[in-house]
């Protein structure tokens, strides 16, 4: 669980900072949220599988 939270935090920071550094005109949280959504769409199957594994471990 800590790994998921850490990964999400890193992706959020990267998605917000990179557009600002690269000087995009619409840089900032709005532009970053679009990038983050794209990343999450690609990650979703892996994330769902991980959450499923965690759930089965908890349930026994």
Swiss-Prot record:
GO cellular component, one term: extracellular region
Glutamine amide PTM positions: 59
Signal peptide positions (record): 1-23
Residue stretch(es) of the prosequence: 24-33
UniProt key word Signal: yes
Localisation per UniProt entry: Secreted
Alphabetically ordered keywords of this record: Amidation, Neurotoxin, Secreted, Signal, Toxin
Coiled coil segments of this chain: none
GO terms of molecular function: toxin activity
Primary location group: secreted
Function summary: Toxin that causes a rapid and irreversible paralysis when intrathoracically injected into insects (blowflies). Does not cause spontaneous nocifensive behaviors by intraplantar injection in mice.
Name used for this protein in its record: Myrmicitoxin(1)-Pr4a
